[in-house]
Amino acid sequence: MAALMYNVSRGLVMLGERSLFQRERYQILVNSRRFLRGLRRRPVAVLYPDGERETLIKSKRATDITSQGFTQKGKARKDVTERAAYKNCSGFVSERAEESSQINKLKLAGLRFEKAPAGDNRLARVSSVARSRAFRDKEGKVLLEGRRLICDALSAGASPQMIFFSLLERLQELPLDKLQQAKLIKVKYEDIKLWSDLVTPQGLIAIFSKPDASRLTFPKDARLQSVPLFLICDNVRDAGNLGTILRCAAAAGGDRVLLSKGCVDAWEPKVLRSAMGAHFRLPVFPNLDWDDISKHLPKNVIVHVADNYSTSTKQLVSGQTENVSSDDYSESDSDDDDDEEEDEDSLPHVKPQVYHECWAQRSAALVIGGETHGLSVEALRLAEETDGKRLFVPMAPGVESLNSAMAAGILLFEGRRQLLMLSDKLRRRARTKML
């Protein structure tokens, strides 16, 4: 009996411990931290056990406030919807109003313009094609960019065909009375920036008929200050150099510029940018044969050439010889210089002279050669026939040559100085005779 009671008590103890352990284990599970998202709920209705619903009785003032709030919200939404629909249908009101006011101003000058639609490729097509020399020669069109260059072209009498602009203010900066025959197209500034060669374009690109120098009207003040000095470019193939040469010729008051075949096109965009409007300040005749060049010069003109490369010039600079005779071109003193001397034997004989000595005493023409090929035989022959000189600029030892544009600037302004001094001398003589 004692043994039975012992076993029963032991079993109860074990059962209690097991339940205790389970309780503690379950308690751990229940008391574990659980991060649950809190939800905010709002009761829809209150139901009582008898099935009735709770009804909320609002005052008349609360009802009026609620209905008034809903009415104001609905009206605001309606206004926003109508405003958006109006914008979608008629475009931005401010832009249209501004354009309409500007259009009224343009109507006073009798002008109309069109706005390029989305996907319009006229600017892209014209800009890419107008930069081709073959297209310019075939179609007779040139591309001008920027307000100043376009204004110079219009003032000289050039004929505009199409003008692309980004803002109406840019268009009004041009002389509107000279745009009657042009087609005006308003495009986005991003399109002009895409097809322009400039980093920061002004928003104006124009297509002109290729100007003819014989039909242009040049500024009277520039022509009155001109001197009988003619510039001939011989195989100048660098666009930047040619543009700078044209600019120097206009600044020095040259009479005209003649470009031989082999020169870069005078209407190349880079030439136009470098010349800074010189095309419309003095006549420029491009793509001429040497026979045509002679026809553009007066009969009593003396043609000089700019050259620093001849052996006689180097000897004169170094002080070895003072006067170079024709015998120096026919005989050689050493076998090392046979090739160089033989080359000069075959060339026309033109005496060298320092540029600051007297050489422009009447109508004078100056030939500037390209840096790659130098002077042509035709240029030297023309200088020989007119008793011209081979002009050179002395330089410090170790310097091979000057840039062609720099040499042209030095010689052109020296020629202008000599011609103006001659004119003043003749004027003083005439006054003395009158007295």
From Swiss-Prot:
EC category name: transferase
Ranges of compositional bias, category Acidic residues: 328-345
CDD domains xrefs: SpoU-like_RNMTL1
Entry's Gene Ontology cellular component terms: mitochondrion
The UniProt record lists the keyword Membrane: no
InterPro entries: Alpha/beta_knot_MTases (IPR029028), MRM3-like_sub_bind (IPR053888), Ribosomal_eL30-like_sf (IPR029064), rRNA_Methyltransferase (IPR051259), SpoU_MeTrfase (IPR001537), SpoU_subst-bd (IPR013123), tRNA_m1G_MTases_N (IPR029026)
Annotated stretches, region: Disordered: 314-351
Regions crossing the membrane: none
Residues the entry annotates as binding S-adenosyl-L-methionine: 369, 402
Transit peptide, residue positions per record: 1-42
Record field: catalytic activity: a uridine in rRNA + S-adenosyl-L-methionine = a 2'-O-methyluridine in rRNA + S-adenosyl-L-homocysteine + H(+)
GO molecular function: RNA binding; rRNA (uridine-2'-O-)-methyltransferase activity
Function comment: S-adenosyl-L-methionine-dependent 2'-O-ribose methyltransferase that catalyzes the formation of 2'-O-methylguanosine at position 1485 (Gm1485) in the mitochondrial large subunit ribosomal RNA (mtLSU rRNA), a conserved modification in the peptidyl transferase domain of the mtLSU rRNA. Also required for formation of 2'-O-methyluridine at position 1484 (Um1484) mediated by MRM2.
Protein name (Swiss-Prot/TrEMBL): rRNA methyltransferase 3A, mitochondrial
Native organism: Danio rerio
